[in-house]
Amino acid sequence: MNNINDSSAIHITPETFVKQIRSLGRYNFPEPALVDPDGIGIVGIGGNLAPETLISAYAQGLFPWFNDDEPIAWWCPEPRCVMQPTDYQPSKSLRKQANNARWQLTLNQAFNEVIHACSLPRSNGLPEGEHTWIHDDMIEAYNELHAQGFAHSVEVWDDQGQLVGGLYGLKIGSIYFGESMFHIASNASKLAFWGLMRLCTQSNVTLVDCQLPNEHLMSLGAITLSRTEFLTQLDTLISNGSDAWHKNSHRPLAVSLLGNLQPWQLNP
């Protein structure tokens, strides 16, 4: 297993990212095909979760995935699950629920609440009190990425103003790297994902990285790419421009409008 080598740090912003793309980060990540020829997925151990390290990793197709009591592990799966936002197909039942709901979607209004909710135990056998791999260090790191304009959340609010679902991830250039989602009301995370697809389509975000394939994602229109093909596309995508997302960039969107062609409205 390759350890990550330290190098000089630089400050990165979404606006200056393209100019700095060749000298990003504090660590030189290994070439996935060289250190993981069998496609297991893990390509490095070590480093830290500083913003410049994370942005450098994502720009090279890697993401961190490790338990709280383990060293940082960097992954680049083979194959890679991705979604083209224009290929997304919501189910008929989800369309019906959206049409009848009085809920709202927002962008970047409750990032910390969303990532904390994503960290809580699911119905996957975790003991009471245990969290997912999204532990305190990860929460702190992605909150910092949110403050710097790279990490974004989509929230779903019910008609009582309660947060009932959401998701978060990173946007670099014209690719969105999905990280996690949650729901406490039926299908709320699916509505958040639908909202994300709408937002990506109108913002020139042409690919969503879903990391690992599963039956649910494939049913929504996701596909798999070989690691080589994903990394080839990534080089272009991270250099492309896309519309800015920030806390006050977009108005709330009624869930009932998800099935319409009306775009997610920008604030004036």
UniProtKB/Swiss-Prot annotation:
Q: Which UniProt keywords apply?
A: Acyltransferase, Cytoplasm, Transferase
SUPFAM superfamilies in the record: Acyl-CoA N-acyltransferases (Nat)
The terms under GO molecular function for this entry are: leucyl-tRNA--protein transferase activity
Localization terms from the record: Cytoplasm
Recorded GO cellular component terms are:
cytoplasm
Q: Which GO terms describe its biological process?
A: protein catabolic process
So which domain of life are we looking at? Bacteria
Reaction(s) the record says it catalyses: N-terminal L-lysyl-[protein] + L-leucyl-tRNA(Leu) = N-terminal L-leucyl-L-lysyl-[protein] + tRNA(Leu) + H(+); N-terminal L-arginyl-[protein] + L-leucyl-tRNA(Leu) = N-terminal L-leucyl-L-arginyl-[protein] + tRNA(Leu) + H(+); L-phenylalanyl-tRNA(Phe) + an N-terminal L-alpha-aminoacyl-[protein] = an N-terminal L-phenylalanyl-L-alpha-aminoacyl-[protein] + tRNA(Phe)
- EC class name: transferase
Question: Known EC number(s)?
Answer: 2.3.2.6
Task: Tell me the InterPro entries matching this sequence.
Answer: Acyl_CoA_acyltransferase, Leu/Phe-tRNA_Trfase, Leu/Phe-tRNA_Trfase_C, Leu/Phe-tRNA_Trfase_N
The family classification in the record reads: Belongs to the L/F-transferase family.
Task: Report the protein's function.
Answer: Functions in the N-end rule pathway of protein degradation where it conjugates Leu, Phe and, less efficiently, Met from aminoacyl-tRNAs to the N-termini of proteins containing an N-terminal arginine or lysine.
Mind telling me which HAMAP family this protein's record contains?
Leu_Phe_trans
Know the name of this protein? Leucyl/phenylalanyl-tRNA--protein transferase
Species classification: Bacteria, Pseudomonadati, Pseudomonadota, Gammaproteobacteria, Moraxellales
From the UniProt record, report the name of the gene that encodes this protein: aat
